[in-house]
Amino acid sequence: SYAIIENDELRHRFQTYMEASEFSEGHLFAYLSVAAAYSHGTEWLDQVVAYIKGNVDFTETYLKEHIPAIKMIRPQASYLIFLDCRALGLNQEELNRLFVEDAHLALNDGTTFGKEGEGFMRLNVACPRVTLEKALKQLEQAVMDLK
C-alpha cells in the first residue's frame, strides 16, 4: 500500500516512521501492480464494487427474513456493516460470546469504537457470497439457540 500526504510536516513524520520500521521499501512487483491497477483496473473495480453491494443487499434481506432481531446499518462507503444487536437484550460480553463461541464468528466488537458501540458488531462483507451465507446461517442458529 502507499500513502499520499499533502502536508509536508506530516509526510516527513510518516516517512521517518516507515523508515524506522523498515516498511519504506517497496519491491518491483508492488510498483508494477499499482501502475497496472490504475491503468487497467477500472473494469475489475466496478465488478468488485457491484459484488460487494450485492453482499450488502443479501445481508440486509437475510437478516430481515431470518434474524429480524438484528438490524443492519447500511455502509456508505465501505464493506463493513454495523449489526445492531441491541434487541437481543445481551450485554457486550454476552454478545461477544454469542458471536465467537456460539456462532463461531470473529467480528469486530462495536465497543472498539467507543461506548456508543455497545450492542453492535461489525461484519465484513467483502468475501465470497458462500462464505457470507455460511456466517449468517451460523449466526441465525446461535440466535435461535438463545430462546
Predicted region positions:
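Alpha-helical elements of Rossmann-like donor-binding domains used by nucleotide-donor carbohydrate transfer enzymes
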Residues: 13, 32-36, 51, 58, ...
